[in-house]
């Protein structure tokens, strides 16, 4: 499932993990199942550690705008190496300067970083229902790969 790459340096060896196609499919299937279980019409986006889109599915009935918001939330979580809710909370707490961050456009809850051993492998972004429910769907997808 998770691909491992070993990097050799002069002193240390570091393992890095990446999402493979099977991981992306497993995340998508589990996230979709969670959404369908609650009859939630959402879009689910999965990105790699650089925020590049690996998978997108817009479920029946999901608003067209969700196909833009879900990848933006995932991108924000991957690039920030933390859930997008952290940025939303900072802004709501008065740190308005984050609104001008150049590459972070999805600073709303619903983007969940995929972390393994302190390394960000990517993120899942969901849009279409309440933001807490978006995050619930994303976490259900990530749980499918044991993280």
Ranges and model annotations:
Residues 10-147:
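Flexible, solvent-exposed loop/hinge segments and secondary-structure transition points
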């Amino acid at each position: 499932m998770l691909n491992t790459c070993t990097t050799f340096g002069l002193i240390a060896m570091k393992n890095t993990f990446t999402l493979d196609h099977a991981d992306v499919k497993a995340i998508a299937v589990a996230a979709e199942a969670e959404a369908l279980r609650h009859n939630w019409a959402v879009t689910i986006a999965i990105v790699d550690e650089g925020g590049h889109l690996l998978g997108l599915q817009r479920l029946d009935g999901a608003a067209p705008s969700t196909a833009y918001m879900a990848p933006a939330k995932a991108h924000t979580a991957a690039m920030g190496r933390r859930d997008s809710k952290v940025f939303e909370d900072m802004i709501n707490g008065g740190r308005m300067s984050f609104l001008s961050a150049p590459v972070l456009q999805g600073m709303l809850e619903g983007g969940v970083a995929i972390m393994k051993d302190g390394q960000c492998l990517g993120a899942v972004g969901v849009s279409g229902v309440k933001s807490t429910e978006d995050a619930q769907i994303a976490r259900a997808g990530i749980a499918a790969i044991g993280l």
